[in-house]
């Protein structure tokens, strides 16, 4: 997936940063949502600049790891609002020493809103439901767009694998519980749009992902 449109909502994917994070941009005629902006590549930066005239511009973070949040300080300075689960606030843009050589910068920012389990975000015909899925990090979440059957799963669930649970704040048992939770809420034809790698329908993931086998 690079770009698709359903009804009046356009969905675009940008692969950004040395760790190749999937950043998703949802736009309508008068609004924009960025999910996990990562560290901006030139293509993403140009696209974002073209949206500065929109009245509603929101960043939604699936979790607080630096590779998913690095573009946030610049975006917030330019009028975007950012949202994150409160359990990941302390992670925001804090770069572990092992990754500093890749060009990541430690640039924490304080301007954000927080959201919790069951939160619903409605803007410009887009309706996203938040599911708290800790395990990769304490505040990891997924955003579900039920009308168009999109699920933005961050680093909780990939097409053929799952996120790491050995990072600070991660927990393997909690992650497995979160995966069971997703199995109970995602419809088979939902397109899973993860934080890294390719996209796949959930019914395909149930067949090929060894971590979701009963």
Language model feature labels by segment:
Residues 39-45, 49-122, 210-211:
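Active-site HxH/HxHxD metal-binding segment of metal-dependent hydrolases
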Residues 10-12, 81, 113, 127-129, ...:
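Conserved beta-strand segments of alpha/beta enzyme cores
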Residues 32, 98, 127-214:
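Metallo-beta-lactamase
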Residues 2-51, 142-154:
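Conserved beta-strand hairpin/beta-sheet module of binuclear metal-dependent hydrolase folds
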Residues 5-10, 99-103, 124-128:
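Short Pro/Gly-enriched beta-strand edge/turn motifs at strand-loop
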């Amino acid at each position: 997936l690079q770009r698709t449109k359903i009804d009046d909502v356009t969905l675009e994917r940008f692969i950004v940063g040395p760790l190749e994070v999937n950043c998703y941009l949802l736009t309508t005629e008068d609004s924009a949502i960025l999910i996990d902006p990562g560290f901006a590549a030139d293509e993403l930066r140009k696209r974002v600049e073209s949206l500065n005239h929109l009245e509603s511009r929101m960043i939604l973070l699936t979790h607080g790891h630096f590779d998913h949040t690095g573009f946030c300080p610049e975006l917030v300075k330019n009028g975007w609002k950012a949202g994150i689960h409160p359990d990941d606030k302390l992670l925001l843009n804090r770069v572990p020493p092992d990754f500093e050589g890749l060009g990541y910068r430690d640039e924490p920012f304080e301007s954000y809103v927080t959201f919790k389990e069951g939160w619903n975000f409605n803007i410009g015909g887009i309706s996203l439901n938040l599911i708290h899925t800790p395990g990769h990090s304490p505040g990891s979440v997924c955003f579900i767009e039920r009308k168009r059957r999109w699920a933005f799963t961050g680093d909780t669930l990939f097409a053929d694998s799952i996120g790491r649970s050995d990072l600070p704040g991660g927990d393997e048992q909690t992650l497995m519980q979160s995966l069971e939770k997703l199995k109970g809420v995602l419809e088979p034809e939902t397109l899973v749009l993860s934080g890294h790698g390719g996209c796949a329908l959930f019914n395909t993931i149930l067949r090929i992902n060894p971590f979701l086998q009963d």
